[in-house]
Amino acid sequence: MIKNITPQEAWDKLENDSDTVLLDVRTTMEFEYIGHPVGAIHVPLMEAPGWQTDPAFCEKVRETLHQSHDMAPEDLTILALCRSGARSGTAAELLTTEGFKSVYNVIEGFEGDRDENKHRGEINGWRYHGLPWEQS
């Protein structure tokens, strides 16, 4: 079962555990233009226009983490993040199935849930909570 973590809990974990990484699984366009958490590693789960899960997603995560960390990628704590927590939940399940031992889904995501006016970023999410982020 995938563990859920709030954006604030995720930031605290990142600040206090050097074996924890934040994995942003949104599309490249979202990551670059909407913004992303400072220090996040980016490996898209899917891209437009097909919007199909990348069959090489787990291997790409493994390769990316292997290049940036001294320990085995499977032994790192991974905090998966997307726009609102849905795609990152799927990513977390895939990574767990592929042998990653400690994977969390960052609920609320980067932009958060939609409010009554269908706007994101007004009720929750990484940016809403004032956590560090940047744009490319």
Task: Tell what function each PLM region has.
Residues 1-21, 28-77, 88-136:
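Rhodanese-like catalytic fold shared by cysteine-dependent sulfurtransferases
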Residues 81:
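Short, surface-exposed ligand- or partner-binding patches at beta-edge/loop junctions that are enriched
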